[in-house]
């Protein structure tokens, strides 16, 4: 197959259209761009040409298009000529376009003095600001705001009994403690000695005298009764401890006395002499009967005997008393607690042989 080498026509021949080339029918469309004397086409600037709607021109002309008369829009020619002159002379001032031109863009210029209508009237809140500050900016603050009342209140000595707190739970309000003076304590103590449980009328009278409320007087009497009860219970426990110690010492002394009855008569006199030396200084008991048998140990000792002769020697009076009990009857001996004297000084030379 043979290959054809097609050669494109020159640019002047295409513009003039005088050459008999095969590309004569396919001439370039008329773009209505002005050219200078040398034939160079000057294009308008991009900023101005961006708003221009360019018509779509088909390169291949149809016979219908050839029959139509060529009409040039004078407005487009005037606009392009003005743009070319402004591009040629940049130092010259641009001419104002006519208001009736369809190619003039309508741009609204916002002056600095007049703010745009889209701006909001309130300030923008920063995200980092606390919530309280944001609420203060967005919500309007009222001058006359209602004051909140809380249960944690304080009173002085002058306003405490007169002005009660204006809250719902006034009875449960936590008040500041006040110290009672010595004069007020004397009045309350005197009333407590007369009657530990005063009635309401008496409490009101005391509250007026002590410059206190009736509730405070009632609480003071309650605390005083509890303190007196606690003091009484502590005294009873200490008395019981002393009594138990006395009973233990009494039992130990009675056991030593009972050992005498089980010893023979030859050694009884020696043990009795030793017992009298170690016995309490107030009194001493000597049992002369050998038939003493204890029944029950405890605080009180009970003895069964046929004939008992008890001799009590009283050291403070210096005389002896003899008590005879009838035969076949029980006699109870009560041993009291005696104070024991501390041991004297011991001579170490007495232990040497």
Curated annotation (Swiss-Prot):
InterPro entries: HD, Homeobox_CS, Homeobox_DNA-bind_prot, Homeodomain-like_sf
GO terms for cellular component: chromatin; nucleus
Main location: nucleus
Residue ranges: DNA binding: 173-232
Organism domain of life: Eukaryota
Pfam families: Homeodomain
Keyword Metal-binding on entry: no
GO annotation (BP), single: G1/S transition of mitotic cell cycle
UniProt keywords, alphabetically: Cell cycle, DNA-binding, Homeobox, Nucleus, Phosphoprotein, Repressor, Transcription, Transcription regulation
PANTHER family given in the database record: HOMEOBOX DOMAIN-CONTAINING PROTEIN, HOMEOBOX PROTEIN HHEX
Functional summary from the UniProt entry: Transcriptional repressor required to restrict transcription of ECB-dependent genes to the G1/M phase by repressing their transcription during S late phase. Genes that contain a ECB (early cell box) element in their transcription regulatory region are transcribed only during G1/M phases. Binds the IMEI regulatory region in vitro, its relevance in vivo is however unclear.
Protein's name according to its UniProt entry: Homeobox protein YHP1
Organism whose genome encodes this protein: Saccharomyces cerevisiae (strain ATCC 204508 / S288c)
Chain's gene name: YHP1
């Amino acid at each position: 197959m043979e290959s054809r080498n097609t050669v494109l026509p020159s640019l002047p021949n295409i513009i003039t259209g005088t050459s008999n080339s095969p590309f004569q029918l396919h001439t370039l469309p008329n773009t209505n761009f002005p050219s200078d004397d040398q034939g160079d086409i000057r294009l308008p600037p991009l900023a101005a040409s961006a708003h221009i709607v360019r018509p779509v021109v088909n390169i291949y002309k149809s016979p219908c298009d050839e029959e139509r008369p060529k009409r040039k829009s004078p407005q487009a020619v005037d606009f392009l000529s003005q743009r070319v002159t402004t591009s040629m002379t940049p130092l010259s001032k641009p001419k104002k376009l006519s208001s009736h031109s369809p190619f003039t863009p309508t741009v609204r210029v916002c002056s600095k003095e007049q703010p745009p209508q889209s701006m909001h009237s309130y300030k923008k809140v920063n995200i980092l600001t606390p919530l309280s500050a944001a609420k203060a900016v967005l919500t309007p603050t009222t001058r006359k705001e209602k004051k909140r009342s809380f249960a944690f209140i304080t009173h002085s000595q002058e306003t405490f009994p007169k002005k009660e707190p204006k809250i719902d739970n006034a009875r449960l309000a936590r008040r500041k403690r006040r110290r009672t003076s010595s004069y007020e304590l004397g009045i309350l103590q005197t009333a407590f000695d007369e009657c530990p449980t005063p009635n309401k009328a008496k409490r009101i009278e005391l509250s007026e005298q002590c410059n206190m409320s009736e509730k405070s007087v009632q609480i003071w009497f309650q605390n005083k009764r509890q303190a007196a009860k606690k003091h009484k219970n502590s005294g009873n426990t200490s008395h019981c401890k002393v009594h138990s110690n006395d009973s233990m010492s009494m039992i130990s002394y009675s056991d030593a006395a009972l050992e005498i009855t089980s010893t023979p008569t030859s050694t009884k006199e020696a043990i009795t002499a030793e017992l009298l030396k170690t016995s309490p200084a107030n009194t001493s008991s000597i049992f002369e009967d050998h038939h003493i048998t204890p029944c029950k140990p405890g605080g009180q000792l009970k003895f069964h005997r046929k004939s008992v002769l008890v001799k009590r020697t009283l050291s403070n009076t210096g005389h002896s008393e003899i008590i005879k009990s009838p035969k076949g009857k029980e006699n109870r001996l009560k041993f009291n607690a005696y104070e024991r004297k501390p041991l004297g000084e011991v001579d170490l030379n007495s232990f040497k042989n």
